[in-house]
Amino acid sequence: LAGKVAGVQISSGATGAGGATRVVMRGMKSLTKNNNALYVIDGVPMFNTGSSGGDGQYGSMGGSDAVADLNPDDIESISMMTGPSAAALYGSAAANGVVLVNTKKGKKEKISLTVSNSTTFSKAYIMPEMQNRYGTSSGLFSWGDLTDKRYDPKDFFNTGSNIINSITLSTGSDKNQTYFSASTTNSDGILPNNSYNRYNFTARNTTNFLNDKLTLDIGAQYIIQNNKNMVGSGEYFNPLVSLYLFPRGENFEEVQMYERYDEARNIMTQYWPTAIFGSELNMQNPYWIMNRMNMNANKRS
């Protein structure tokens, strides 16, 4: 829908692979509340029950949204609704507009088998503008002497990928139509150790009775979903804070070995020397966050 519907702004979340997508229709309507549109799938409102990640220094991992459970190849059509007409049908939940999604049914035809693949790649494109001319004076403040060292945050990011494989089967007669589909979605985010995997299975049968005066439409979906290491909000669990504020002039390769053996405690501990990076912010080693503070969310429904 991006760039195809007037007055609709669509942006991906900053939580990485598997994160929710923000859909805002005709501008923001609230400064403090949610501005996302309501999804209605086959006439059923789907509310986003995922976590937003929270605010403050210790915000948690964000969540996905209801429409992310769908196999894209199961979608027949998408339309938008806003204003009084949306409120009349769906009440106050539709104050920010409605995205109407209709899924596919079986068709009156012989057996039709479709196999599809979609592969996309992503990279970190725009970095915050930071000065790299002066090194570190004390703590994390970069206003020391001139330095010839160059630190590029892009070195932390990977090339992300999103691969969707799908197979659909449709068949039917004048009185009965059947539709089956199965799909896999496998994504690797641009951040290390961030991934999203989803497996969809759909079955739907439509039968007409009493000279087409009565229609019985039965459908079922089974979804297996795994979110691994979506980026946390706030400061402490967010690797991007320490990545972007890393003092210029220091050696970033030194912290890539993110853990050291602590003889006193007899365990591996995080390597993040506060003598270099200061204690003004609640930050952690970004490699430690992505490799040792794994936050996973699994769902079967």
Describe the role of every protein-language-model region.
Residues L1, V8, G43, I78, ...:
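Non-catalytic regulatory/gating segments with a bias toward low-complexity or hydrophobic composition
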Residues K4, G16-T21, L31-L38, M46-V67, ...:
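Residues embedded in well-ordered regular secondary structure
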Residues L38-V40, T114-S116, Y179-S183, N200-R204, ...:
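Outer-envelope exported proteins of Gram-negative bacteria
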Residues P72-M81:
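Phosphoinositide-dependent membrane-docking surfaces
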Residues E76, K175, S195-Y196, T202-N205, ...:
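A conserved hydrophobic secondary-structure block that centers on an alpha-helix together
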Residues M81, N102-K104, T168-G172, S181, ...:
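Transmembrane beta-barrel domains of outer membrane proteins
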Residues S85, G91-A95, T103-K105:
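Periplasmic N-terminal soluble interaction domains immediately after the signal peptide in Gram-negative
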Residues Y90-G91, L191-S195:
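Short, solvent-exposed loop/turn segments at secondary-structure boundaries
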